[in-house]
């Protein structure tokens, strides 16, 4: 039991140290993408700089052009939207909601008092 525990703890500790060493090595090199090339961008450029340079080269075809087109769309309010909305007078069976059980109507099992007879 103790031998298994010690071997597990040794494995766990060594794995953590290895992971820590790997993350510190990548953090010390700077940008993770510094060694990669994206469509001819210089190594050391960030992905954002590379995309911006590519967009400028392709006559603004890309993310910025899509955002610009979305922002240039005109949205209009219809007359129906501007009309006064119906309101209730605050009672349980208000003006905008039909009466549930008018006076004199009997409540049956079938209706369950949800609608008038």
UniProtKB/Swiss-Prot annotation:
Subcellular location: Secreted
Keywords, alphabetical: Disulfide bond, Glycoprotein, Hormone, Secreted, Signal
Major site of localization recorded for this protein: secreted
GO MF term (any one): hormone activity
GO annotation, biological process: calcium-mediated signaling; cell-cell signaling; regulation of growth
Keyword Disulfide bond: yes
Disulfide partners: 88-96, 107-113
Residues bearing glycans: 31
Keyword Membrane: no
Propeptide stretches in the record: 28-71
InterPro entries: RALF, RALFL27
Signal peptide coordinates: 1-27
Entry's Gene Ontology cellular component terms: apoplast
Protein's job: Cell signaling peptide that may regulate plant stress, growth, and development. Mediates a rapid alkalinization of extracellular space by mediating a transient increase in the cytoplasmic Ca(2+) concentration leading to a calcium-dependent signaling events through a cell surface receptor and a concomitant activation of some intracellular mitogen-activated protein kinases.
Family per record: Belongs to the plant rapid alkalinization factor (RALF) family.
Protein name listed in UniProt: Protein RALF-like 27
Gene source species: Arabidopsis thaliana
Native organism taxonomy: Eukaryota, Viridiplantae, Streptophyta, Embryophyta, Tracheophyta
Protein's gene: RALFL27
């Amino acid at each position: 039991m103790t031998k298994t525990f010690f071997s597990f703890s040794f494995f766990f500790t060594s794995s953590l140290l290895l992971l820590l060493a790997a993350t510190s090595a990548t953090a010390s090199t700077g940008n993770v993408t510094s060694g990669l090339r994206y469509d001819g961008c210089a190594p050391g450029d960030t992905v954002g700089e590379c995309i911006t340079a590519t967009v400028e080269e392709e006559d603004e075809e890309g993310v910025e052009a899509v955002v610009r087109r979305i922002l240039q769309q005109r949205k209009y309010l219809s007359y129906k939207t501007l009309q006064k909305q119906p309101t209730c007078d605050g009672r349980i069976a208000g003006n905008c909601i039909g009466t549930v059980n008018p006076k004199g109507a009997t409540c049956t099992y079938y209706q369950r008092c949800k609608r008038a007879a």
